[in-house]
Amino acid sequence: MYSILPALVSSVFLGYGLYVLCTQGFTRIGISFSVLCVTSAFWQGTWAVLFQVHNPAVAIFLIKFGYLLILFLPTSLYHFLTEVSDRPQERHLVYLSYGLASILAVFLIGSDLFVSGYYEYFWGYYPKAGLLHPIHVLQTVVVVNRGLYITYMQQRNAHPTNASGCVSALPAY
């Protein structure tokens, strides 16, 4: 029952990502959008399965796999917004953010510093934040706000025919 919504959302994201690749091809915007969609789809799909398992060992595996994807979501959104805004000078910051997410991924996989177990609720297992989790929250706040800011500034300064792409990207997030 509690897995229906994450499974549905997962399917929608996967469909969007594949649709864009099939219709737009492998462009910088299309690839970055598809990475965002596929990452979101697999994260939501993992949570849909997580809410159905009853084995703690399977639950911790799914939690770590799901969080591995969550770590890269803010950066993939930032990457997409950087491409939509046509800001190649931002790419080094995007790569830096991917690097930070990769470092956090090492801690996630190799220790309990990022996710320190799980809570068991009536609807299933859910991750328990570890000591390093606030770093991810801070990264999320910084890169999402930066992405929204550059998209807003690009839209504000764009020719009216080019501004529509930036405007349509903002409400999606």
Could you say what each language-model-derived stretch is?
Residues 18-25, 82-86, 152-159:
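Structural signal for the C-terminal ends of transmembrane alpha-helices
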